[in-house]
């Protein structure tokens, strides 16, 4: 729904190829500690790595507004705040006036150069928490998927930001499931959490957390929290961001429900912080919640928060208005500055911290929670490429957009068995091995399955056409690592592929990604099941049966 930020600290004298490194922030995380190299054992707090002082986020969401909350968007013209050096030079001094030690950015372009802005942030003692998605490449709540395109986007952001010591971690999703009608989408986000954690470990990057930012929906809040922190450590979040706007004007600890937040998370085993906060129903905002957030009742449980947001936009949440390239402080800025200057959060030292909350949560089983504990498979480009090369009938490269959706409806409506290997059902936890491939690759698999089934009946002569959308190709018999991958997937694509991406058919190391099932099928328009249903009603039997 909105944006947020993370934490800051003291700079080390030690140099780096990019800039003088800030003291990394580490997480004391109980059951996770044994599996995350470099992270101390036990607990649910952020600490400065060198001196062990507890770290509380005093953050600001820093990005021009766009939607990253699980809704569809074709926009790709977002502004990367970490690549705009002049804006960084202009804005960071104002952030320092608010004692900012963390910013949250919602979308960066991994192809751009971020060295100068990250250097300016490091020099100012400011850390970064970055969302992995961008407006046109994110997990959509009403048509979720976890595929090659998303995997490539997410890993490219990790690759780009891993070089900076002032990056605390990443959000794999922001308010994707936001009510009881779309909880199944959380399975795809949790698969992204699992795979990014495994990727960071596989690349031998320094310790960086992968978390999720949730909205404050009373109906699904508890189930959501439990789901992202249950079953297996390697697929559970490393920190939990809470977008909360319940404290408006001169509210109170109890009236706002902050007391319930503390009660709910007092035994949680990973750090919790407000990923967005700052109700604007009363203006100018008074930010009196700052005293509660950093006071003695909340700091034992909540590790600070991120104010939404720096820039003044149409939504009227801004601290600063940019006019003619120059910043103008708004009344909200002055209110926040006044409140933040009063706080002195008291924490604990890492060495003396004795956590008792180390267990994972129990997975939700309520009637309103539809996401299975069985997650979509890890995207595997090698598997998809090997599969397409092995086919005799494939989709033409010219088939795109809405035509893809219609063709899925046609082939799956005519032969449901042809689509078993590409469908994904996050409620039942059933995923085809190729459900994480690109739409074109999935359509090629379905076309070929239909063609093979018709050929077995003696009807193959015209079965690879689909109105000119399909074409025959000379198939390649899989060999070597390709043979291993395709064999694991099975002839109909319903097998379980246990090879990690790029591993050439080898199983992942212990503690890396969990058994690969297969991410969801997103056709980009409507879910595949709906296409099948509509195609059957429309009489897709015009094709040979």
UniProtKB/Swiss-Prot annotation:
Compartment annotation: Secreted; Cell membrane; Secreted, Cell wall
Leader sequence segment: 1-19
InterPro entries in the cross-refs: Glucanosyltransferase, Glycoside_hydrolase_SF, X8
Residues the record marks as active site: 175 (proton donor), 276 (nucleophile)
Gene Ontology CC annotations of this record: extracellular region; plasma membrane; side of membrane
SUPFAM superfamilies in alphabetical order: (Trans)glycosidases
Enzyme category, top tier: transferase
Propeptide: 513-545
UniProt record, GO biological process: fungal-type cell wall (1->3)-beta-D-glucan biosynthetic process; fungal-type cell wall organization
Binding, (1,3-beta-D-glucosyl)n 1: 106, 133-141, 174, 308
Keywords from the UniProt entry: Cell membrane, Cell wall, Cell wall biogenesis/degradation, Disulfide bond, Glycoprotein, GPI-anchor, Lipoprotein, Membrane, Secreted, Signal, Transferase
Post-translational modification: The GPI-anchor is attached to the protein in the endoplasmic reticulum and serves to target the protein to the cell surface. There, the glucosamine-inositol phospholipid moiety is cleaved off and the GPI-modified mannoprotein is covalently attached via its lipidless GPI glycan remnant to the 1,6-beta-glucan of the outer cell wall layer.
Residues anchoring lipid (GPI-anchor amidated alanine): 512
Its job: Splits internally a 1,3-beta-glucan molecule and transfers the newly generated reducing end (the donor) to the non-reducing end of another 1,3-beta-glucan molecule (the acceptor) forming a 1,3-beta linkage, resulting in the elongation of 1,3-beta-glucan chains in the cell wall. Involved in cell wall biosynthesis and morphogenesis.
Disulfide bonds: 88-117, 230-363, 248-279, 384-437, 393-464, 412-419
Family per similarity comment: Belongs to the glycosyl hydrolase 72 family.
Residues with glycosylation annotation: 51, 69, 179
One Pfam family, short name: Glyco_hydro_72
Amino acids binding (1,3-beta-D-glucosyl)n 2: 175, 216, 221
Region ranges (Disordered): 493-513
Protein name: 1,3-beta-glucanosyltransferase ARB_07487
Molecular functions per Gene Ontology: 1,3-beta-glucanosyltransferase activity
Membrane topology: Lipid-anchor; GPI-anchor
Enzyme Commission number, as recorded: 2.4.1.-
């Amino acid at each position: 729904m909105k944006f947020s930020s993370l934490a800051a600290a003291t700079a080390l004298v030690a140099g780096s190829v990019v800039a003088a490194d800030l003291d990394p922030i580490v997480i004391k995380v109980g059951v996770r500690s044994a599996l995350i190299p470099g992270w101390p054992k036990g607990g649910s707090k952020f600490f400065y790595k060198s001196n062990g002082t507890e770290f509380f986020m005093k953050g600001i969401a820093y990005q021009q507004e766009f939607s990253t909350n699980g809704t569809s968007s074709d926009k790709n013209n977002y502004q990367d705040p970490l690549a705009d050096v002049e804006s960084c030079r202009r804005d960071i001094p104002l952030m320092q006036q608010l004692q900012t030690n963390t910013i949250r950015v919602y979308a960066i372009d991994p192809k751009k150069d971020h060295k100068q802005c990250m250097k300016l942030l490091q020099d100012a003692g400011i850390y970064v928490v970055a969302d992995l998605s961008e407006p046109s490449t994110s997990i959509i709540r009403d048509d979720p998927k976890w595929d090659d395109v998303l995997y490539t986007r997410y890993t490219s952001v990790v690759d780009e930001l891993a070089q900076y010591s002032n990056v605390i971690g990443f959000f794999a999703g922001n308010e994707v499931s936001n009510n009881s009608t779309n909880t199944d989408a959380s399975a795809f986000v949790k698969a992204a959490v699992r795979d990014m954690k495994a990727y960071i470990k596989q690349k031998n990057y320094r310790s960086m957390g992968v978390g999720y930012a949730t909205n404050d929906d009373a109906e699904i809040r508890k189930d959501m929290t439990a789901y992202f922190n249950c079953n297996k450590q390697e697929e559970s979040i490393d920190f939990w961001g809470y977008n909360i706007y319940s404290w408006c004007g001169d509210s109170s600890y109890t009236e706002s429900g902050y007391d319930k937040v503390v009660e709910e998370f007092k035994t949680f085993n990973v750090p919790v912080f407000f990923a967005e906060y700052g109700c604007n129903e009363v203006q100018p905002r008074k930010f009196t919640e700052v005293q509660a957030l950093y006071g003695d009742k909340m700091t034992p449980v909540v590790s600070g928060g991120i104010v939404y947001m720096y820039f003044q936009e149409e939504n009227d949440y801004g601290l600063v208005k940019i006019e003619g390239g120059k910043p103008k402080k708004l009344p909200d800025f002055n209110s926040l500055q006044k409140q933040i200057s009063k706080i002195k959060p008291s924490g604990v030292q890492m060495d003396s911290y004795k956590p008792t909350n180390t267990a994972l949560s129990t997975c939700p089983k309520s009637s309103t929670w539809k996401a299975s504990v069985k997650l979509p498979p890890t995207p595997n480009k090698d598997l998809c490429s090997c599969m397409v090369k092995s086919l005799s009938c494939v989709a033409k490269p010219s088939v795109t957009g809405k035509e893809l959706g219609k063709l899925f409806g046609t082939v799956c409506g005519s032969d449901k068995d042809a689509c078993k290997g590409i469908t994904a059902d996050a409620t039942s936890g059933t995923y085809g091995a190729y459900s994480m491939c690109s739409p074109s690759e999935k359509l090629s698999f379905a076309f070929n399955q239909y063609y093979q089934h018709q050929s077995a009946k003696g009807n193959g002569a015209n079965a690879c056409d689909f109105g000119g959308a399909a074409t025959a190709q000379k198939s390649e018999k899989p060999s070597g690592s390709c043979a291993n991958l395709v064999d694991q997937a099975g002839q109909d694509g319903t097998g379980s592929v246990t090879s990690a991406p790029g591993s050439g058919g080898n199983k992942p190391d212990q503690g890396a990604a969990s058994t690969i099932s297969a991410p969801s099928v997103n056709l980009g328009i409507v879910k595949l099941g709906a296409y099948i249903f509509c195609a059957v009603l429309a009489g897709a039997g015009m094709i040979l049966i």
